[in-house]
Design a protein with these regions (language model features):
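Conserved, well-ordered alpha-helix/loop/beta-strand core segments that scaffold catalytic motifs
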Residues: 1-77
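Catalytic His-Asp segment of secreted/periplasmic serine-dependent ester chemistry enzymes
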Residues: 53-126
Length: 126
């Protein structure tokens, strides 16, 4: 990655407060929640501070336990060879690793995992 992104504490807090409000609203309206942590490429250094990224995942897990909804971590389900590359953001014009997008097969894997969890989750709550 060309840079390491850090958590901005004020924005992070506001975003999590907003997320918590959405969770409460969903539950008030009897909407089932399945939250997942998105896939991320894991064969190279990720563009986030590891401590910040771990905190984020732990905070999602905490919310799932507090509000009793299903949370799954899918960060490692897309194989590294299925991640996309992007055009350079520097003067070098070399392609760069894209941490946000993966190829079609990666989307199929993600969809299959989410579908499996939804089927299992809805079966468990009905």
């Amino acid at each position: 990655p060309s840079s390491t992104r850090k958590i901005l504490p004020g924005l992070y807090l506001k975003n999590f407060q907003a997320l918590e409000s959405i969770i409460k609203l969903a539950q008030e309206n009897k909407i089932k929640i399945l939250m997942y942590n998105v896939p991320i490429r894991n064969d190279v250094k990720i563009p986030y501070k590891i401590d910040d990224y771990s905190k984020f995942k732990n905070d999602l897990d905490y919310l799932s336990k507090k509000y009793l909804f299903k949370y799954i971590n899918l960060e490692n389900i897309v194989p590294n060879n299925l991640w996309a590359e992007k055009t350079s953001t520097t003067l070098s014009n070399e392609t760069e690793i894209d941490f946000m997008h993966f190829k079609e097969k990666g989307h199929e894997i993600l969809a299959e995992n989410i579908y499996f969890e939804i089927k299992k989750f809805w079966k468990d709550v009905n």
